[in-house]
Amino acid sequence: MTDTQNPKSSNQMWGGRFADGPDAIMEAINASIGFDKRMAAQDIAGSRAHAAMLGATGIVEPSDAQAMGEGLLTVLSEIEAGNFPFSTALEDIHMNVEARLKEIIGEPAGRLHTGRSRNDQVATDFKLWVRDQLDACEAGLLALIRALLDQAEAGADWVMPGFTHLQTAQPVTWGHHMMAYVEMFGRDLSRVRDARARMNESPLGAAALAGTSFPIDRHMTAQALGFDRPAANSLDAVSDRDFALEFLSTASICAMHLSRFAEELVIWSSAQFRFVALSDRFSTGSSIMPQKKNPDAAELIRAKVGRIFGANTALMMVMKGLPLAYSKDMQEDKEQVFDAADNLMLALAAMTGMVSDMTANRESLAQAAGSGFSTATDLADWLVRVLGLPFREAHHVTGALVALAEAKHCDLPDLTLEDMRGVHAGITGDVFDVLGVENSVQSRISYGGTAPVRVREQIARWRALL
């Protein structure tokens, strides 16, 4: 026996068939209490529901069930007060809670695990925890969407450049750009709600994998824990973590949207763009350059997204080769989800704060909107509507006019009518009406377009939805 071995199993929950205790290294790799103690509230909620059901069905004496329920509340209060004696030797939150319950109420604590396994217990705890996080994500997304709506409403008719390839494309409005993110985060909100609805089935009572011979009432515990129904197949209930993967997938898509917006805020707040000014509350300075005001919140959001993507991939890799039902590999599911949830909630809160506090520079936006031949498409459309040119010919004529303006180092509205007629003789003076950026955005009245009237309709629709 090595120095790291224990002479007898230190775990009284499952050690009956073992002659020797686990090696200290085995205890270290096997223990999850360092992270799964975050599920203490969920574990105790599940155990209290199970205890109440055991008493109601007569599987245990009602007095024992009551003692278990009250004792579990005492355990919860100790954990919340920060003076609970967590033990690595007891491996996880489930055994730590049960061991402490036995110290408090004695022999009845040993009846709590009747008709239950750690397999369905941990699946229940984890589902409850993920469900709580989905609710928190929903609240965070709603706050961000409302902040974006406020920005969109304030600048519904402020002209700015729209980009493709980060090159000037067409004029749009600030409100239209903000509403694009409202739509993206709105779909994230829908995915969060869908994921919550799909996962809301209770694993409790599935036991190890095959169910139990005790006359338990799974519908009772499901209802007590706020689930819509018990999971229909006990083997599936303890085997899969697709609810956690769906959370991570949903979080990854939302994080991607946050990262794209963060990237734009980094660019827009630079001295080269000056589209927005971020508040001091969400910026930092430099230790050597006194003039610096850095968009660190946006940059950190952009970086944290990688951790969320990584968590999704990591859990996929854990689950991809596991036969049914439970394997110890699945203990590695929680840290990924915990970290992703923490970083997503922090990123949502930081983005909401930045959006709420940032100030758009209307003058810089308008000036940039008129550069880069942004109304070239309006010119091509005018050639089609007024002169009857096929669009491909209009596209070619407009390209030639852009080349002429570039050669003259001017923008399209600065060309003379004579310049334009040199490219196409049919052009009339009315063409200048479509070359202004204000007229350009006002003309985009198709459903979902950038015209202020359409932007305000979009805002009103979202206000009503929320």
Curated annotation (Swiss-Prot):
Compartments where found: Cytoplasm
InterPro entries reported in the protein's UniProt record: Arg_succ_lyase_C, Argininosuccinate_lyase, Fumarase/histidase_N, Fumarate_lyase_CS, Fumarate_lyase_fam, Fumarate_lyase_N, L-Aspartase-like
Source species, domain of life: Bacteria
Disulfide bonds: none
GO cellular component: a single term: cytosol
UniProt feature coiled coil, ranges: none
Keywords from the UniProt entry: Amino-acid biosynthesis, Arginine biosynthesis, Cytoplasm, Lyase
Enzyme Commission no: 4.3.2.1
Secreted listed as a keyword: no
Pathway linked to the protein: Amino-acid biosynthesis; L-arginine biosynthesis; L-arginine from L-ornithine and carbamoyl phosphate: step 3/3
Pfam families: ASL_C2 (PF14698), Lyase_1 (PF00206)
The reaction(s) this protein catalyses: 2-(N(omega)-L-arginino)succinate = fumarate + L-arginine
GO biological process, alphabetically ordered: arginine biosynthetic process via ornithine; L-arginine biosynthetic process
GO molecular function: argininosuccinate lyase activity
Keyword Lyase (UniProt): yes
Protein family per UniProt: Belongs to the lyase 1 family. Argininosuccinate lyase subfamily.
Designated name of the protein: Argininosuccinate lyase
Species for this entry: Roseobacter denitrificans (strain ATCC 33942 / OCh 114)
Gene designation per UniProt: argH
